[in-house]
Amino acid sequence: MASAGGGGSESAAPEADRPQPRPFLIGVSGGTASGKSTVCEKIMELLGQNEVDRRQRKLVILSQDCFYKVLTAEQKAKALKGQYNFDHPDAFDNDLMHKTLKNIVEGKTVEVPTYDFVTHSRLPETTVVYPADVVLFEGILVFYTQEIRDMFHLRLFVDTDSDVRLSRRVLRDVQRGRDLEQILTQYTAFVKPAFEEFCLPTKKYADVIIPRGVDNMVAINLIVQHIQDILNGDLCKRHRGGPNGRNHKRTFPEPGDHPGVLATGKRSHLESSSRPH
């Protein structure tokens, strides 16, 4: 009798005693102006519209740009002249990035730094990010460091023609009031070489490569369907691996990791001021 009673109390355990939800973490990489953030927004939009389990999932987009290092006075002076390399791996605070993503994966509330490219400084204000069902983390070098790369449940690489990326970047920066000569000098001196040396080689780590970015709706729809299957606990899809047929090296979140408590239907998008990528 005592054993039966104990079992009944366990089934009635309060919500606070149950395991905390763990987000489905997606890494999205690609060159500057490849359309990474646009792809993230489209995935977020489609996941929000397609009511999985008759509810909206809470979705968050984070940018690697938030984790730029605090610059010294000398580095700031170079940045103002377009002479600082924001595309180099050493430009990022990888320790803080790893710690933040680790806490996100563990279902914890985190504070994400805010980086201002107008003043080239990390602002005192931070953005609080609460546990979410799906977190998309985008940036040019999100696959560069193995300890960060291995945290993603799904890795996407947005593959866009270099001429298209350059034209987008020039148009975007000119609209922000930057000098055309400085834009092109920075691109040839830092952006293009860094892409070829640091970003492009990480393409091999992607589970899915998306040619043409958001214009490739066939690929994006397949990715969204795959994410929905994973979140719904479709074991067949989980064991087969990603949409490209390759098995993942990591374990996807368990079916019970996404309880209804997070089903707020709210969507968040964190983006740094005047982001370079």
From Swiss-Prot:
User: Which CDD domains did the record assign?
Assistant: UMPK
Q: Where is the composition biased (Basic and acidic residues)?
A: 268-277
Task: Give any Pfam family that matches.
Answer: PRK
Positions binding substrate in this chain are D87, Y115, H120, R169, R178, Q186
- Cite the residue spans of the region called Disordered: 1-30, 238-277
Domain of life where this protein originates: Eukaryota
Against SUPFAM superfamilies, the record matches this protein to: P-loop containing nucleoside triphosphate hydrolases (SSF52540)
Keyword presence, Protease: no
List the pathway annotation: Pyrimidine metabolism; CTP biosynthesis via salvage pathway; CTP from cytidine: step 1/3; Pyrimidine metabolism; UMP biosynthesis via salvage pathway; UMP from uridine: step 1/1
The record lists the catalysed reaction(s) as: uridine + ATP = UMP + ADP + H(+); cytidine + ATP = CMP + ADP + H(+)
- Report biased composition (Basic residues) as residue ranges: 238-250
Enzyme Commission number(s) from the entry? 2.7.1.48
PTM Phosphothreonine: list the residues. Answer: T251
Q: Which GO molecular-function terms appear in the entry?
A: ATP binding; cytidine kinase activity; uridine kinase activity
**Which terms does the UniProt entry file under GO BP?**
CTP salvage; UMP salvage
InterPro entries in the cross-refs: P-loop_NTPase, PRK/URK, Uridine_kinase-like
> Which residues participate in ATP binding?
G30, G31, T32, A33, S34, G35, K36, S37, T38, D215
Q: Which UniProt keywords apply?
A: ATP-binding, Kinase, Nucleotide-binding, Phosphoprotein, Transferase
The entry assigns this protein to a family as follows: Belongs to the uridine kinase family.
Q: What does this protein do?
A: Phosphorylates uridine and cytidine to uridine monophosphate and cytidine monophosphate. Does not phosphorylate deoxyribonucleosides or purine ribonucleosides. Can use ATP or GTP as a phosphate donor.
Tell me the protein's name. Answer: Uridine-cytidine kinase 1
The organism is: Mus musculus
Gene transcribed to yield this protein: Uck1
